[in-house]
C-alpha cells in the first residue's frame, strides 16, 4: 500500500457508483480502493430473499452496515440478527455467513484494507440497471469461483445457511 500518493475525496449518492451483478446480487462500488490509496473500499450490496453465501473467510476485515431488510448472521460460532442500522464486523480470517430473511436486504460493506471490490469485479458482470440481476445473468462456474477465490484470498469453509437454518 502506498502512503498518501493516490488519495482523493469521493462523494456518491445512494445507488451511485460502479455497478456489478455478482452471483445473484447487485454490488455498487461506492468508494473504490484506488481512490483512497487502497486503505479501504466501500460497496453497497442489494441481496434477494434467502441469499446466503457459503461459510467463508476473507483476507481483509469486513464490516456490514444494514440499511434495509433483515439478516441472520453466523460468525465465529455466534448467531445474531441484523436489522436496519445493525452492524456486523468480521475481522480477517473469521468464518462467517448470513441469510437474507426479508424480501430483499441492502447493506454497506466496508473492506479494510481494500480487497473485496476485486471479488465483485472478477466474479460479476457489469450491471446495466441498479436492480437485482435478471435470472439469466451469467454466473461463474464452480471451477471459476474456486479460481477467483484462490486469486483473491477468500476461503470457503462450509455450506450457506438454508431457509430453515
Positions of PLM-derived features:
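A contiguous, mid-protein "functional segment" used to position or interact
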Residues: 103-150
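Short acidic-glycine-tyrosine-enriched beta hairpin
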Residues: 11, 35, 70, 77-95
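Glycine- and acidic-residue-biased ligand/ion/polar-headgroup-sensing regions
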Residues: 49, 60-71, 76-77
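A short, N-terminal "cap"/entry segment at the start of jelly-roll beta-barrel domains
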Residues: 1-39, 132-165
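Ligand-binding loop in jelly-roll beta-barrel domains
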Residues: 36, 72, 92-117
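Short strand-coil-strand connectors
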Residues: 23, 74-76, 101
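Conserved strand-loop elements at the edges of beta-sheets that form or border functional pockets
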Residues: 47, 57, 65, 84, ...
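Conserved short histidine dyad/triad with adjacent acidic residue
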Residues: 29, 41-57
Amino acid at each position: 500500500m502506498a502512503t498518501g500518493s493516490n488519495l482523493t475525496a469521493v462523494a456518491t449518492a445512494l445507488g451511485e457508483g460502479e455497478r456489478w451483478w455478482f452471483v445473484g446480487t447487485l454490488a455498487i462500488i461506492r468508494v473504490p480502493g484506488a481512490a483512497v490509496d487502497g486503505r479501504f473500499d466501500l460497496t453497497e450490496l442489494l441481496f434477494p430473499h434467502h441469499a446466503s453465501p457459503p461459510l467463508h473467510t476473507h483476507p481483509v476485515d469486513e464490516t456490514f452496515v444494514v440499511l434495509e431488510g433483515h439478516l441472520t448472521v453466523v460468525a465465529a460460532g455466534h448467531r445474531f440478527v441484523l436489522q436496519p442500522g445493525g452492524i456486523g464486523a468480521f475481522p480477517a480470517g473469521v468464518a462467517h455467513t448470513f441469510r437474507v430473511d426479508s424480501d430483499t436486504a441492502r447493506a454497506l460493506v466496508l473492506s479494510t484494507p481494500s480487497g473485496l471490490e476485486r471479488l465483485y469485479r472478477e466474479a460479476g458482470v457489469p450491471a446495466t440497471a441498479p436492480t437485482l440481476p435478471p435470472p439469466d445473468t451469467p454466473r461463474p462456474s464452480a471451477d471459476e469461483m474456486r479460481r477467483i477465490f484462490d486469486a483473491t484470498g477468500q476461503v470457503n469453509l462450509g455450506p450457506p445457511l438454508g431457509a430453515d437454518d
